[in-house]
Amino acid sequence: MRANSCIIAAFCAIILMAAACSAAAEKAAQDDPLLFKQDAWPLLQVHCVRCHGAKKQKMGVDFSTMTGLLSILGHRDVWRRAREALESGDMPPDPEETSFTDADRKRLMDWVRDRVETIDRRSPIYLDPGPPVLRQLTRVEYNNTIVDLLRLDRFDAASAGGIVDPSNFVSEHFANLAAAQSLDQTLVEKYLAAGDAALDVLFNRNAKARSALLSAHPDNQTSPHDAARVVLTRFLRRAHRQQVDGDELDELLGIFDDATRAGDGFEPAIRKAMRPVLVSAAFLYRIEEDRPDAGSDAYKVNDDELAVRLSYFLWSSMPDDELFALADAGRLSQPDVLDAQIKRILADPRARALTDNFAASWLRLAMMNRALPSQDVFPALTRSLKDAMRQEPALFFDNLRAEDRSILDLLDADYTFANEELARFYGIPGVSGPKMQKVALSPQFHRGGLLGMGCILAMTSHTDRTKPTARGKWILDVLLGTPPPPPPANAGNFAAPNNHAAPPKNFREKLALHASDASCAACHKRIDPLGFALENYDGAGAWRDSDAGKPVDNVGRLPRGKEFQGVEGLKQVLHERQEQFIRNVVTQMMTYALGRQLQYTDDLAVADIVDALKRDDYRFSTLIRGVVMSRPFLYRRNG
């Protein structure tokens, strides 16, 4: 009966939501300042429908079905992608062929921006904080939580129980996304082994941690049962990260009492009571309870849930005592208190987790572990140099947090981090010792920002040469958030056509020949120019002015015909697409914080954070505060 009621309630909620959206769209249609049929549809018919219409739907887009505001409302994600393609010049792919002028581009972009913003702010659907997700602790979060819960110095679930993350950091997903996670019987057994190992360290090898955790002991005034109640109440509060359930506490006390009746002492009995907690759903998952009285309406998460969201976002671990105390007092959600906690948590060394878990995944830094360049071809690329290269982007990103710098430093900066070996590889004098340190840069070194870092350049190279396509794709994927579609099945085939008069003279000509294939041309026009701009860096990331005795060809040409040269020209191109980069950083950070892919209902939150960054010099703390203060972070709805 309850299941049927839930289905009926959900169906009614969908109908009500659709009706509300319909009404909003109809109202928007009445006072639409840029009429769709006059300003947008004629341009789409002439320049877009040929590839994105009823007969052909490239990228799965069919504009022929979107002939009014109601249909537009249901395809907001498509319009967002269209706006980005127009802004970047990626679409139309051949503007000259279709007579698509700059005025046409501006008119269509103006219409898309106005419609997206107008519809977004009027539609009640944008009050939706997004679907609730059930998030399992990642291996890193599990390790950190065990350490903080049991007051240990360190713990490694991989060695203790064989636990690894359910998703791969090298993939396009963060390991903490709910959709990438699962829990089966084998993993439960591994968690049980890891929990036993952690309790073994606590009770047998760490007297200081044990003393802190066992806050009560039996004596003449306190019975073993009463002392256990004190210890287990606090332990359960911190382990489950929510208010203590009396029935669960009684179950643990029952385990304790059974153990003492069987002859166990106080500490062995406490250990037996703690054991099931470490494999409980409330420990392994971040559980947020639905509120039946809320119906389909969004509601603020409670202070316990907010503390958990905040600490796992910024520390990849459980709340500390201060967060628990504020949550218990019902004060954490007060704006001034929450703002102060954001500053405190960001300043804590544990916030390095943002670098280790967010930045490492977003930037695909794990690719460096299997970077292809060979030391036989590039003798300077020693193991120690590779290690320094790995550290550079991580230290750089963490410095943005520690010094609250502009996130635009990721595109270009007058400093980096290097030790003596890496500085020598870069041609930077005056750096000594094996320790990584902050180093000032000048233009003559051709570094600054992510694009000048050896790690990024080496991990996007072949064994014996550069790989412009991989470098260009990394820029589109990671920096701009506009990944090209997967290549066709024969994309790796570089064989020249039979009618080609002469073989290509160099790799650039070979790639150009390959890109001339109709199935490859559109993507390579976007990808290759960006990669060729980095040709002054060899396969290992060292600067060079010539290749095989000839000057390096580092000229790129964008789809709209604009030429640029070298890494400095590329940085200028990225500067012109700065808002797209900022929006992508915000999108990536929100995805990581929420544990789910964003949807079009999150667009307003993203736009508000982008606007806040513009007003505050793009400071790192403004990005984090914007995410935490956003509606999707502070609110939830029933599943």
Regions found by a protein language model. Give the residues of each.
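Aromatic- and Gly/Pro-enriched helix-to-coil junctions and flexible linker segments
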Residues: 21-214, 237-238, 242-245, 249-254, ...
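Active-site-adjacent structural elements in folded domains
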Residues: 215-222, 238-239, 260, 291-297, ...
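Bacterial N-terminal signal peptides
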Residues: 8-19
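Sequence context surrounding c-type heme c attachment/ligation sites in exported
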Residues: 21-81, 88, 95-102, 239, ...
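Secondary-structure transition/capping motifs at alpha-helix termini
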Residues: 262-265, 317-318, 330-333, 428-433, ...
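Positively charged n-region of N-terminal signal peptides that target proteins for export
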Residues: 1-5
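Alpha-helical scaffolds flanking conserved acidic
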Residues: 226-227, 231, 266-274, 300-306, ...
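Extended surface/linker regions that mediate inter-domain or inter-protein docking
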Residues: 111, 133-136, 141, 147-151, ...
